[in-house]
């Protein structure tokens, strides 16, 4: 061995250091390269979300109502109930709590003062010296792109209903203020792309749901219960790792938390009653956790020994029950509170002990009502104010003087509008720096070859239509009118968009066709009528053909067809259709669907239930039929609507990998309330959750140009609150007696 200066060990050390530095730089460069390919814009639909327009409202109860339950007849009140809007018409705002600032800790109030609320608090105290301390509103808002917890000062001192003049003055003061609501995540470092929901305040601590920690297995909810202290600035996970909890409620003492949990069972895809268990544990650290009762959800503490919750009774009605969480007797059975004849759910207990607030569904509209615990009668509330609007998730103020809820702000009782526009596109917080995410007011978005335009199926028309808009949501134009879905832009002919023409979710024998729509990029802006023509590419009598996707060179289309009696994949000529060329790509007595062809022509991604009937996994296949293999499996769940990145190296898709993010009864109708967007590399590695939502996200499209939230257009449509309530509530029999305010 040759030595240098008689010190070989230093020579070796130098070589090792150089090698380490080289490999580190190489690995870092590779990681940066991999991260760099995850870029552009993913547009997608969130079912109904763009028309929710949720704001939080309260109704002040008359003072004599606090004595309700003394066995007298229905409460009679001479004046009309008044509703106060507590949030300010941005994005969607929901799941609130209203608490007196006198119950908040000094560290919390100091934080709010430092944030800029000091003058507002002092102003209210000066104006209302004899009133109770101002109230704090905790609520969830998506105003910054993801569901986050905010704390704000409501319109009036103590949440009291004021005269129109007084309320107008106060609203002006608040809206002209530069002080935004305080976002809870400001107390901690790191991104906030995940969901925070269902906040409750006790002392200096906020307890809430968060999806920040991934679950340990597919199809398990990421929901966990967390607490953030204003005194210590420390955030703790209270749920055990690997356990999914929903709908937390804090005891009046602040010592205990009760949750609805999937602990001890697997979620099997149910979207109505979840058969959760109610667990109680210490609010300080999650210790002393134990099961209270099986089959319950949405707990609400009335006092230290009474918790109300909902479940589906044996007679089929959603009903409210109560239980003593500290009664250790083995024969304790929950007591049914609300009678059969009306669906009652999402209870909110009052501190009076005489009544509870509940959501009900009697006909087709969800309302908030009061249930008298002694007379066993319902009292109308929101139906008297907005009879044709859905109202969600009631809450009761800490004084029990107000009942709150959230509803679409689109209309006043007199029919006038309270919202300026339902946006056409809206930014969503992305966990990846170079990747933009946007909601689209429609479905099946597809990007033009240069990424500057988006074709999509509009959701605001009486019948579906194909629209085209700019990437920022401006210059919307109607291209094709009729029942369309499953859009795909031609990669070489910028004026051609392929579409599925016909009804959705139909049998293999239904007539559904693939069409090529012309002049998609030059249609008249805001035209009243469609300005493009189309060409049928599939033959008459070939039954159900859907989801076209062009090859990277624009010569061929892959699509799903049921012409054989089973839904499999076929390839045809992109210009002249199957009349010129047709090739069957897959064959079997299963469903292969949602094909997407990579821009480099190498792979076709698709969803298939060939491994588990009715459950869909992600597959890849070469266009010549070779190389078929499964990329990801949700075992036994759903992976649907895959879409390649513009560079063909990654895939985005919708899946139930993260289970549910809320009890489905607490949100509007969703076809699949467990759908979120994920991406991965084409070999299945690098799986990343993109969206965190209690609503269904799906039908993604991926364009090559990123778009900042500040660049998005404010154009949209007139608000009309066009969304449905859940479809799993069925009317069974006659409704029980109810009362109303007069």
Describe each model-derived feature in a short phrase.
Residues 2-742:
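Sequence signature of WD/YWTD-type beta-propeller architectures
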């Amino acid at each position: 061995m040759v030595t240098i200066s008689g010190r070989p060990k230093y020579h070796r050390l130098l070589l090792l250091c150089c090698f380490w530095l080289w490999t580190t730089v190489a690995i870092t460069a590779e990681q940066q390269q991999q991260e760099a390919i995850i870029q552009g814009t993913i547009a997608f639909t969130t079912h109904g979300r763009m028309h929710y327009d949720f704001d939080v409202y309260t109704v002040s109860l008359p003072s004599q109502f606090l004595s309700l339950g003394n066995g007298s007849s229905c409460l009679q009140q001479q004046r009309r109930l008044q509703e106060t809007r507590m949030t300010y018409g941005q994005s969607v705002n929901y799941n609130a709590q209203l608490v007196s600032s006198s119950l908040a800790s000094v560290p919390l109030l100091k934080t709010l003062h430092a944030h800029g609320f000091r003058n507002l608090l002092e102003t209210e105290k000066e104006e209302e010296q004899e009133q109770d301390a101002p109230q704090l509103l905790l609520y969830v808002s998506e105003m910054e792109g993801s569901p986050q917890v905010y704390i704000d000062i409501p319109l009036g001192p103590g949440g009291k209903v004021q005269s129109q003049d007084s309320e107008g003055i106060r609203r002006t003061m608040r809206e002209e203020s530069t002080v935004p609501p305080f976002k809870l995540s400001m107390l901690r470092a790191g991104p906030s792309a995940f969901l925070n929901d269902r906040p409750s305040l006790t002392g200096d601590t906020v307890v809430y749901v968060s999806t920040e920690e991934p679950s340990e297995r597919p199809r398990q909810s990421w929901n966990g219960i967390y607490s953030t202290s204003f005194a210590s600035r420390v955030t703790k996970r209270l749920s055990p790792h690997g356990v999914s909890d929903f709908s937390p409620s804090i005891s009046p003492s602040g010592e205990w938390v009760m949750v609805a949990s999937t602990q001890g069972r697997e979620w099997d895809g149910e979207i109505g009653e979840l058969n959760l268990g109610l667990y109680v544990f210490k609010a300080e650290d999650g210790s002393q956790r134990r099961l209270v009762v099986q089959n319950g959800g949405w707990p609400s503490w009335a006092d230290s020994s009474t918790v109300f919750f909902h479940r589906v009774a044996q007679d089929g009605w959603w009903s409210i029950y109560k239980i003593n969480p500290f009664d250790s007797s083995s024969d304790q059975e929950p007591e049914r509170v609300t009678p059969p004849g009306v669906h009652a759910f999402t209870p909110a207990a009052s501190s009076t002990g005489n009544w509870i607030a509940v959501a009900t569904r009697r006909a087709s509209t969800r309302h908030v009502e009061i249930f008298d615990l002694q007379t066993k009668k319902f009292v109308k509330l929101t139906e008297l104010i907005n009879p044709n609007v859905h109202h969600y998730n009631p809450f009761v103020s800490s004084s029990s003087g107000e009942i709150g809820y959230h509803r679409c702000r689109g209309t006043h009782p007199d029919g006038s509008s309270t919202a300026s526009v339902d946006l056409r596109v809206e930014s969503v917080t992305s966990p990846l720096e170079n990747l933009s995410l946007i909601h689209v007011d429609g479905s099946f978005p597809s990007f033009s070859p240069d990424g500057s335009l988006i074709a999509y199926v509009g959701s605001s028309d009486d019948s579906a239509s194909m629209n085209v808009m700019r990437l920022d949501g401006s210059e919307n134009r109607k291209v094709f009118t009729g029942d369309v879905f499953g859009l795909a832009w031609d990669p070489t002919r910028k004026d051609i968009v392929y579409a599925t023409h016909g009804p959705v979710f139909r049998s293999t024998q239904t007539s559904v066709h693939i069409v090529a729509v012309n002049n998609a990029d030059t249609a008249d802006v805001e035209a009243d009528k469609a300005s493009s023509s189309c060409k049928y590419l599939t033959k008459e009598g070939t039954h159900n053909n859907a989801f076209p996707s062009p090859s990277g060179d624009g010569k061929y289309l892959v699509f799903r067809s049921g012409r054989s009696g089973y839904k499999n994949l076929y390839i045809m000529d992109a210009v002249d259709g199957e009349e010129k060329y047709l090739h069957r790509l897959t064959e079997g007595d299963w469903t292969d669907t949602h094909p997407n062809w990579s821009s480099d022509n190498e792979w076709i991604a698709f969803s298939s239930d060939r491994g588990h009937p009715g459950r869909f996994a992600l597959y890849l296949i070469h266009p010549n039929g070779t190389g078929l293999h499964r990329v990801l499996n949700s075992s036994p769940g759903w992976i649907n609507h895959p879409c390649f990145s513009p560079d063909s190296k990654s895939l985005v898709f919708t899946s139930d990998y993260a289970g549910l993010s809320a009890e489905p009864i607490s949100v509007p109708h969703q076809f699949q309330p467990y759908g979120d967007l994920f991406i991965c590399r084409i070999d299945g590695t690098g799986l990343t959750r993109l969206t965190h939502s209690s609503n269904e996200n799906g039908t993604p499209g991926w364009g090559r140009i990123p778009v900042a939230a500040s660049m998005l257009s404010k154009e949209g449509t007139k608000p009309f609150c066009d969304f449905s309530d859940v479809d799993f509530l069925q009317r069974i029999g006659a409704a029980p007696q109810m009362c109303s305010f007069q």
